[in-house]
A protein has these predicted regions:
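Conserved loop-alpha-helix segment in the C-terminal half of the alpha/beta-hydrolase fold
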Residues: 222-260
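Flexible "cap/lid" loop of the alpha/beta hydrolase fold
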Residues: 112, 120-154
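Conserved alpha/beta-hydrolase catalytic His-Asp/Glu region
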Residues: 132-133, 158-219
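Catalytic histidine-centered segment of alpha/beta-hydrolase-like enzymes
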Residues: 260-273
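Short glycine-enriched nucleophile-adjacent loop
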Residues: 104-115, 121
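Conserved alpha/beta-hydrolase "nucleophile elbow" surrounding the catalytic nucleophile
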Residues: 32, 99-104
Length: 280
């Protein structure tokens, strides 16, 4: 499923970043979630339609999909720098951004650090502000060390991203209607989760041990960009999460897509595109 259609790699300091570029017009950068197996394929149902009016850049984050799976400790700041450098060196101008899930925290911090790079921002089911405040403790650090042990860590990681567990992830957490799960999408997640061999476990170990968490409240309050949140109707605690974001920054607008969960742009691409056209 994860075809490499061209040689579009951004040579970055921590590894090569795979991306695609489609269409012409004002730029939009699409950034996928950080769940195990996530990649730019997450946007496959909407990127061609967006490319009619925009230049659409879709990236595979470092450690994900077709990008390098570097054996580093992944932190929020690593992705903040990656996104900012990508905009500066590849897009080359101020850009709109749509970020899914946990990646919304990267975009928020990147915009806070270098606001001249960002225009409008759309966050799709962003992470809980309370969750983001949780920092690694001793138990988390031990977990990370265990997951990075060559044989043991690889075995545990492969159990976590087994075919059955990926399918269960979609059925239980990603889709409003489990009978409508897109098999091609779950296949792409499974492929991405195993691409890169045993190095794939390093991103998961950093995620599981909370190394990617960061308190974004101060950044969110300071932003004066137009920010729009798209929430899946049945996303767990979705209303509480968006209420917290709006309390931090009252200028934020929110739209709820009916009969969707964690991936509204996959479950209801037409309804999602309507929101994109309204906002951008």
């Amino acid at each position: 499923m994860l075809h490499i259609s061209n040689d579009n790699y951004f040579e970055w300091r921590f590894g090569n970043i795979y991306y695609t570029k489609k269409g012409t017009g004002s730029p939009i950068l699409l950034i996928h979630d950080t769940l195990p197996g996530a990649s730019g394929y997450e946007w496959s149902k909407i990127e061609d339609e967006l490319a009619i009016d925009h230049t659409v850049y879709t990236v595979d984050l470092l450690g994900c999909g077709r990008s390098d799976k570097s054996s580093i400790t992944y932190t929020n700041f690593v992705y903040v720098q990656m996104i900012s450098d990508f905009i500066k060196k590849i897009i080359g101008q101020k850009t709109d951004v749509i970020a899914s899930g946990f990646s919304g925290s990267f975009v928020t911090m990147a915009c806070h650090n270098e606001k001249e790079l960002f225009n409008k921002i759309m966050l799709v089911n962003p992470p809980s502000l309370t969750q983001l405040k949780q920092m690694p403790n001793r138990k988390d650090r031990l977990l990370k060390a265990a997951l990075e042990i060559p044989i043991f860590g690889t075995l545990v990681y492969h159990m976590i991203v087994s075919r059955d567990n990926i399918n269960n992830l979609f059925i239980e957490k990603m889709y409003y209607n489990p009978f409508h799960v897109d098999n091609q999408m779950s296949d792409a997640y499974y492929e991405a989760a195993h691409k890169g061999g045993y190095y794939t476990r390093f991103l998961y170990s950093s995620l599981a041990a909370k190394y990617i968490n960061i308190n974004i409240c101060h950044a969110l309050k300071a932003l004066d960009n137009s920010i729009y949140i798209v929430e899946g109707e049945t996303e767990p605690n979705g209303k509480a999460v968006t209420d917290d974001y709006c309390a931090s920054n009252p200028a934020i607008e929110v739209s709820v897509l009916k009969e969707t969960k964690h991936l509204p742009h996959v479950e209801a691409p037409e309804a999602f595109l309507e929101q994109v056209k309204i906002f951008f």
